[in-house]
Every structure is written in C-alpha cells, then in structure tokens.
C-alpha cells in the first residue's frame, strides 16, 4: 500500500517526551482557558492507557465518544483515498490532541487513528466532559472560539 502524506502536523525535531495531564490541561489551547476549577474537576477523570504500535485506536465511521492526547509516542491519523492509497492527515506527537471533532459533536470519526510506535495516551470520555459544559456555559463559549 502506498502512503500519501497530506499536511503532516509533526514539527521537525519533535520529541516523544512525556506530558503530565495537569500540564496538558493547563497549557493546551483546547483546555487552557477553562479555568482552574474546571480543570481540577476534569483532571481526575482523565485516564492513561498504553497502546501498542499498529493497534487501532479508532476507525473512520466509529462513534466519537473519547478525546485523546498523546503523552508518549506518536499516532498516525489517516484514511483511505478514492485511489485506495492511505492518505496521512496528521502525525500526533506528545502534547497534542486528536479526535476532538467527533468527541464534541458525538458524530462519527472521519479518519483512522493508529500508533506508529508504542504510545501512552490520555483519554477523556465524552460523558465526563459534557456535564462540565452543562454546569459551566462559559466553557462551551470558549470551546466555540477555538
């Protein structure tokens, strides 16, 4: 199978260092403006899991109930093109998120997510995040601006 690289987001020289969940929540644009009280409520709900190289995290068409952040390793986001080639949309490295669109709208995944090396991921369940939005309308407003 031939790979086609499309808009690869991995920076030159990016490393696979680890990121703590509090650091990620306080510094990533998706979360940083949520405020300490919301982040302190969310952090205990973040789980850490290990995923082996080549294991499928999700496939195009799966329902998006989780948001992922890479803590260590790297994840390829891709989908088959009409020509049957695997088009790579992004390589997600430590400190970056993936799966946020389907996570927020509860819709279907638009691509596959597969680690290109052994990974450690931080995972937030939609069912844990939505009550924070419901209880804190300003959180929803901030997310809309992102």
List the model feature ranges, each with a label.
Residues 1-146:
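Cytosolic regulatory regions built on CNB/CRP/Popeye-like sensor folds
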